[in-house]
Design a protein with these regions (language model features):
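Aromatic-residue-lined binding/catalytic grooves and analogous aromatic/hydrophobic interfacial grooves
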Residues: 1-325
């Protein structure tokens, strides 16, 4: 791998969220954790929020600012706070919500622990995620991007032999439903909750759903592979493949016309995009991304970029700017 200054690089999978590597196109985002036995990708969508479109401002006609000021000056803070909460402040702002988690799990147990040359990284010049390692003489490679041009997330897995045997499971932390469709496709659909309390505010019902209310959303995942495919509920099973390409997209009915069907939209998008070769999608993504990325360049001097990103961060915390970053 290229460990240039514009490359985030790790020699182990992420163990926590802030070690995962981000991809996004301004609408659909993904956090890639990497992994050998189980890999995880968390997705989010820009328009997936709680709420149902109601006016959350305070309609009280008792907005007596002078009384509040007087209470504060008299150090009667409880009275001032009570009046503010009842007559001035509106309800909580809406909560931004996670969309889904995709797990890629090996179908068989590893008999040996010797993994050679594990590496995962993010090439900032091309917005490409890459992961490589060797196991029992077989080379495994992953590459992923989130295309602004075609509005899809794409992940390619490749092995030097027909050694890719995976279960791909799509789940949502919301009350979504995942169904297998034709053409090696999973479709996740659901409605966002109408109310989500802040995590620091304790109440009896911190998350509230209401049937038919809340933002409707959908996410689609389609597989193209040289292996055998079987779909069972929320899982795609793949056997004896040497190459797998995953294409995913998502949408919601936020600020859309009445009758907008997110599930139909993502199904149509996947159908249209699946006819494009992986290399074409990759080239279109890089060209669109670099139009913005290459508009300027910031040089901060030489850096010891042979170290992994987590090692550079650790040294920076310990030593400051002593040529470690």
């Amino acid at each position: 791998m290229n460990h240039a200054s514009k490359y985030l690089y790790y020699n182990r999978p992420a163990t926590k969220w802030n070690e995962a590597l981000p991809l996004g196109n301004g609408r659909l985002g993904a956090m890639l954790f990497g992994g050998i036995d189980v890999a995880r990708i968390d997705f989010n969508l820009d328009t997936l929020w709680s709420g149902e479109g109601r006016n959350k401002s305070n309609s009280s006609d008792k907005k007596d600012w002078n009384a509040i000021r007087t209470a504060i000056l008299e150090e009667d803070y409880k009275a001032a706070e009570k009046s503010l909460q009842e007559n001035i402040l509106g309800d909580w702002s809406e909560a931004y919500l996670p969309l889904a988690t995709l797990t890629l799990e090996r179908r068989e147990e590893r008999l040996r622990e010797d993994i050679e040359g594990y590496s995962r990284g993010l090439d900032l010049t091309q917005a490409l995620y890459k992961e490589t390692y060797i196991e029992e003489g077989i080379s495994y490679e992953q590459e992923a991007f989130c295309s602004m041009e075609d509005k899809v997330f794409v992940l390619k897995l490749k092995a030097s032999k027909t050694a890719l045997n995976l279960n791909l499971k799509l789940k949502s932390p919301l009350k979504g439903i995942v169904e297998g469709e034709k053409q090696h496709t999973l479709i996740l659909t659901g409605h966002a909750p109408i109310y989500v309390a802040p995590n620091y505010y304790h109440c009896e019902d911190p998350v509230v759903y209401k049937e038919g209310k809340g933002i409707a959303y959908a996410m689609g995942l389609r597989v193209q592979t040289t292996g055998l495919v079987h779909i069972e509920e929320d899982t795609i099973h793949i056997v004896d493949a040497d190459e797998i390409v995953l294409i995913s997209t998502a949408t919601s009915d936020f600020e859309q016309e009445i009758g907008y069907n997110p599930a139909s939209v993502v199904a149509e998008q996947l159908e249209n995009i699946s006819h494009m070769p992986y290399e074409t999608l990759r080239e279109r993504h890089i060209e669109a991304y670099q139009h913005y990325f290459n508009a300027m360049q910031l040089e901060l001097g030489e850096a010891k970029t042979d170290r992994t990103t987590d090692e550079r961060l650790r040294l920076f915390e310990e030593e400051g700017c002593k040529d470690t970053a």
